[in-house]
């Protein structure tokens, strides 16, 4: 049985405001496009994209409780900012709520976990989510157009 994207969308929407949900939709569109270019299952990329910010608005205490003892190599750093912590907390929240999201694929969970900071030896899916988050259509930073073009040619540049 495949991933139920509609179920993921419905449940993710419960945790995000409208502005953040629109961002997630744009990330999903960018991730799907990149997945098709790099021969990654589009379903995995879309699922990871919809899930990547699920913990964005969790209270800091909840985020810390979700990750405590699981990531000692980054635990001191991640507790300092929700911008980093929400990826790790989101991965654990998804893992702990299989009934809600239907995801236990470690590659998808890693893509959620590392979407803000990256990691060594990232999978192609993780690179796609990392980049899709940065280059989605709502982003307007200097150089984003060039980054969008480059992402379609090489995920490692």
Task: Show which residues each predicted segment covers.
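N-terminal glycine-rich anion-binding loops that anchor highly charged ligand groups
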Residues: 23
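Divalent metal-dependent catalytic cores for phosphoryl transfer on phosphate-bearing substrates
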Residues: 9-15, 34-156
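Non-catalytic interface/linker regions that flank or bridge core catalytic/transmembrane domains
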Residues: 1-2
């Amino acid at each position: 049985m495949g991933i139920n994207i509609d179920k993921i969308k419905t449940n993710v929407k419960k945790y995000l405001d409208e502005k953040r949900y629109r961002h997630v939709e744009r990330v999903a569109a960018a991730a799907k496009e990149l997945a098709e270019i790099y021969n990654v299952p589009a379903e995995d990329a879309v699922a990871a994209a919809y899930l990547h910010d699920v913990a964005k608005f969790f209270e800091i205490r909840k985020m810390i409780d979700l990750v405590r003892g699981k990531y000692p190599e980054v635990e001191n750093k991640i507790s300092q900012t929700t911008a980093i912590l929400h990826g790790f907390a989101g991965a654990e929240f998804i893992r702990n709520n299989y009934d809600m999201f239907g995801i236990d694929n470690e590659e998808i969970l890693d893509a959620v976990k590392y979407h803000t900071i990256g990691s060594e030896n990232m999978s192609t899916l993780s690179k796609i989510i990392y980049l899709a988050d940065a280059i989605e259509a709502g982003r307007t930073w200097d150089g984003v157009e060039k980054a969008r073009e480059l992402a379609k040619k090489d995920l490692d540049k």
